[in-house]
Amino acid sequence: MTFCYPCRAFALLTRGFTSFMSGWPRIYYKLLNLPLSILVKSKSIPADPAPELGLDTSRPIMYVLPYNSKADLLTLRAQCLAHDLPDPLEPLEIDGTLLPRYVFIHGGPRVFTYYTPKEESIKLFHDYLDLHRSNPNLDVQMVPVSVMFGRAPGREKGEVNPPLRMLNGVQKFFAVLWLGRDSFVRFSPSVSLRRMADEHGTDKTIAQKLARVARMHFARQRLAAVGPRLPARQDLFNKLLASRAIAKAVEDEARSKKISHEKAQQNAIALMEEIAANFSYEMIRLTDRILGFTWNRLYQGINVHNAERVRQLAHDGHELVYVPCHRSHMDYLLLSYVLYHQGLVPPHIAAGINLNFWPAGPIFRRLGAFFIRRTFKGNKLYSTVFREYLGELFSRGYSVEYFVEGGRSRTGRLLDPKTGTLSMTIQAMLRGGTRPITLIPIYIGYEHVMEVGTYAKELRGATKEKESLPQMLRGLSKLRNLGQGYVNFGEPMPLMTYLNQHVPDWRESIDPIEAVRPAWLTPTVNNIAADLMVRINNAGAANAMNLCCTALLASRQRSLTREQLTEQLNCYLDLMRNVPYSTDSTVPSASASELIDHALQMNKFEVEKDTIGDIIILPREQAVLMTYYRNNIAHMLVLPSLMAAIVTQHRHISRDVLMEHVNVLYPMLKAELFLRWDRDELPDVIDALANEMQRQGLITLQDDELHINPAHSRTLQLLAAGARETLQRYAITFWLLSANPSINRGTLEKESRTVAQRLSVLHGINAPEFFDKAVFSSLVLTLRDEGYISDSGDAEPAETMKVYQLLAELITSDVRLTIESATQGEG
């Protein structure tokens, strides 16, 4: 690489000085560091560079920066010292040779130009490579680092983005003064100079080539952090109006409504005003300060996992589409905050039009929100304007975020996906864009959701309250201790790769002018949406609250002694750690006792003390609300819970029969909870879970049979209770189908809900989703897909009765009698 000496002290080093930090350079850096230590409060990306990037501090490390800046160098030094990384101002001694530990790619502009020893800089880097030639055991880790003061993308003025943002001394002074507390030190994965020397040699031409690659690396990194320049809003509207699709829609609007062309065009502009974001970097900065202050007081921590894979995709030039689950209105702010602090551009966010009220609407708009109506039906002009606006965001290179569920989950489970915006995303690809679009599934989890009380009321029939300023203020006034927050980035889905695999001829449908809907679009979008939901659940996060709620709700009296709760949490934790749900899911590293202590601090549970010990109680009024948190991780425990239910009921059962039972019920569970395994993967998963349950002492294995272990029967029963309500719901629907094979789909869903509500009252089932309309609708669709209901709508009575009998064995006799008597009473 082409490098320059950071200062003349390094020239003195090579002439025999034993310490760099002596004399004038030492005084200079100390004087410069004094104001920087006051003005600059930088953040490291990633948060803990050494472990997250796999840096080996026992091996030599040198830093590469994009351009000569002492302020950048000292900012880097502060982060290195804070994270136990080598001090960049301390030279490296290798085989008796002293070399500076940092190198600048570019000399950078100056107020007063002076000679920069470019050739000596190239020689310096060449010396690093040459040392690897003479010492085969040497392996220096070269770590590219960029330091950014502020991340304003600027406005479009016709010029292209500069490859590097180089500032002279005066400009840097004002940047530090104004943006010192909005600065980031971005560490990139290291490059092995040993590998470079072995594979490419050590001559000066290699250094020059590496310099070009490094310049490209830093330019891409800046684009990933800052994003493309922002257009003037009116210029964007003019471009949209000039598009053929909107021009045609305007003509159709004028003709169909018998209005003038000018009036139809004004209608289109009004829709653009309603939809379009008005992104403001200053609003991002201000909100970041406010949220940073707020999060630190409300949350005990925001846990982020797998962000590096997203940073790499942004660096590689992918068009990123963030697809998170939707738990709360807080999701909008939390995800943008996390992305900003991961060195990525906050995305343009598709927000429901219900949030476009004063003052939230204008604020959200400046934070990147663009607003979407609940339905596009019957308004061709609106759908065309929205689709063209979304396509324009993609073509300009802005990252986008939308909630594929279409709304917030009221139950804590993932909702069935709404595919409209996803379909438009693929249509944008069919316009022939050059940048690859990649979908990023994201799991967002909380230990406290501020709307959870409202959700419970809505599930019990209350009318949804319209979003407004008073409602927002009431919600904010209730914010107290929110515990931990979780943002887990799931496995990315590159759309081009997906289409190449599943629709090899998709490029034949590319039309740069018109939005097309080829025959393969709808089924492909449905499959992609289902896959996204699975990937979101794959990134699930277990935490103290959802684990404790799962255990306490499994108890008939919603109470356990502290010892029992500890034992149950250990069961869950060991299952999740030793047989992970997926490589992207996360499990707390804390002990069960520590998790219980943390959960008790959330003030959701009561503790009764007696002479024997503590009893932890989930109050009845809290029980309904706590099902929300249990449901967040239901998918991670449902398979071991089902196995435990089967073993508990049969007392002992062979692996083959257990496998048969699971195989019958699994398709319904997979569809309802978006489980990750295909049927052919089940035997290996069940074997792994059975072995883990044996290791825990929950069961014993004898002659290929699973036997209940009486010594740990309570723990096994509590584990089994995790599937109890799901099995009861299935039993209701299968009994109704068996009793009336010709029942139509609508009636089946309605009667299933009626019986479920009756069961809920008679048997004290507190879960609102137990009789949720969407859950039964999804179940009936799955029964049709699995062949239990024929194309004509009639059930297969022999098959449905067989499944009902299997389910009847897994539910209690009193619940079974309630189900059967309810339908007989109707007859």
From Swiss-Prot:
Which gene holds the coding sequence for this protein?
plsB
What Pfam families has UniProt attached to this entry?
Acyltransferase, GPAT_C
Q: Which UniProt keywords apply?
A: Acyltransferase, Cell inner membrane, Cell membrane, Lipid biosynthesis, Lipid metabolism, Membrane, Phospholipid biosynthesis, Phospholipid metabolism, Transferase
The keyword Mitochondrion is annotated on this UniProt entry: no
Question: Which family, according to UniProt?
Answer: Belongs to the GPAT/DAPAT family.
Report the GO molecular function annotations: glycerol-3-phosphate O-acyltransferase activity
Membrane topology is: Peripheral membrane protein
Where does this chain carry the motif HXXXXD motif? 325-330
Pathway listed for it is:
Phospholipid metabolism; CDP-diacylglycerol biosynthesis; CDP-diacylglycerol from sn-glycerol 3-phosphate: step 1/3
Sorted alphabetically, the Gene Ontology BP terms of this entry are: CDP-diacylglycerol biosynthetic process; fatty acid metabolic process
What is the E.C. number? 2.3.1.15
> What's said on domains?
The HXXXXD motif is essential for acyltransferase activity and may constitute the binding site for the phosphate moiety of the glycerol-3-phosphate.
Q: Does the keyword Ligase apply?
A: no
Which reactions are catalysed by this chain? Answer: sn-glycerol 3-phosphate + an acyl-CoA = a 1-acyl-sn-glycero-3-phosphate + CoA
- Name of this chain's protein: Glycerol-3-phosphate acyltransferase
